[in-house]
């Protein structure tokens, strides 16, 4: 056995690294032209199409800015740039990029404590993903009637609250922002978390506050059919560090990537 292989120090302490580099490229499952034929169906501009083709033809997928968040050695990946953009635009402390608005909702509901037997009050009208994400988090959606705006009616919420209720999930529908003042008043009175579904109202405001920054967590979709379209993707915003870390654990399949991975937890 070589002297290197008998090294007792951890890589962190200067010992042998388990992986020092990646050689070669895997064969893609589909060709660039086939991918572009699919992308073309979304009706994107020629500039957007050219940008997507440049990414698809790049040789830096594994170690470049597009897929690598942790091992590329870059100061900022494309996902991290997207998260930074979300923080800057909406003034939130934390942001988490996901593969869809539904995934953002799943992360959010798990973060606020939804689980087996726990209930989340959702609007009776809206996209199915809101309630589906509650079920995905092992919770039970309870449907609340809507008012003339077609958004959740704050006056109808209290009758639905039980000892199992942990959160409200107002959905800002078709660009219309919910009555967040009324919804937040009920949530504060009963000690409930609020997860805003902003998939259809990105940029909408309630007074001086952006939709998605009023409750505990805001969840956005950037699919090709949304107000801000990016092909497919989602974004979670919050000002609560603990909620962000819990949501990030879901996104990372149970991992917890702190800025310093070896730091002690910052909460009890």
Question: What positions do the PLM features span?
Answer:
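Short glycine/serine/threonine/alanine-rich loop segments
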Residues: 92, 139-140, 192
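Active-site region of PLP-dependent enzymes
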Residues: 4-24, 31, 201-207, 214-268
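Small-residue (primarily alanine) positions within well-ordered alpha-helices
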Residues: 95, 104, 108, 139, ...
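Hydrophobic alpha-helical segments that mediate membrane insertion or helix-helix packing
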Residues: 86, 104, 120-121, 134, ...
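Active-site phosphate-binding strand-loop segment of PLP-dependent enzymes
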Residues: 148-245
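Structural detector of well-ordered beta-strand residues that form the stable sheet scaffold
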Residues: 96, 121, 142, 194-195, ...
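Conserved PLP-anchoring active-site segment centered on the Schiff-base-forming lysine
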Residues: 106-161, 167-169
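Conserved PLP-binding active-site segment in aminotransferase class I/II-type PLP enzymes
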Residues: 1-100, 107-110, 188
């Amino acid at each position: 056995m070589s002297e290197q292989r008998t090294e007792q120090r951890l890589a962190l302490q200067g010992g042998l690294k388990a992986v020092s580099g990646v050689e070669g490229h895997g064969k893609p499952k589909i060709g660039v032209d086939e991918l572009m034929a699919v992308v073309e169906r979304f009706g994107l501009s020629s500039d957007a199409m050219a940008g997507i083709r440049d990414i698809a033809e790049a040789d830096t997928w594994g170690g470049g800015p597009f897929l690598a968040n942790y091992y590329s050695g870059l100061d900022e990946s494309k996902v991290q740039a997207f998260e930074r953009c979300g923080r800057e635009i909406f003034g939130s402390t934390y942001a988490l990029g996901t593969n869809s608005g539904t995934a953002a909702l799943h992360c959010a509901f798990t973060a606020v404590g939804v689980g087996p037997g726990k209930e989340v009050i959702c609007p009776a009208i809206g996209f199915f993903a809101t309630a589906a994400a509650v079920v995905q988090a092992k919770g039970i959606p309870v449907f609340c009637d809507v008012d003339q705006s077609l958004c959740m009616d704050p006056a109808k919420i209290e009758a639905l609250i039980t000892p199992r209720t942990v959160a409200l999930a107002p959905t800002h529908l078709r660009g219309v922002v919910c009555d967040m003042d009324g919804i937040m008043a009920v949530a504060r009175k009963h000690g409930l978390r609020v997860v805003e579904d902003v998939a259809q109202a990105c940029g909408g405001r309630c007074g001086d506050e952006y939709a998605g920054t009023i409750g505990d967590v805001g969840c956005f979709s950037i699919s090709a059919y949304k107000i801000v379209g990016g092909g497919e993707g989602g974004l979670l915003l919050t000002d609560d560090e603990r909620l962000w870390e819990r949501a990030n654990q879901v996104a990372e399949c149970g991992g917890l990537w702190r800025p310093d991975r070896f730091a002690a937890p910052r909460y009890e």
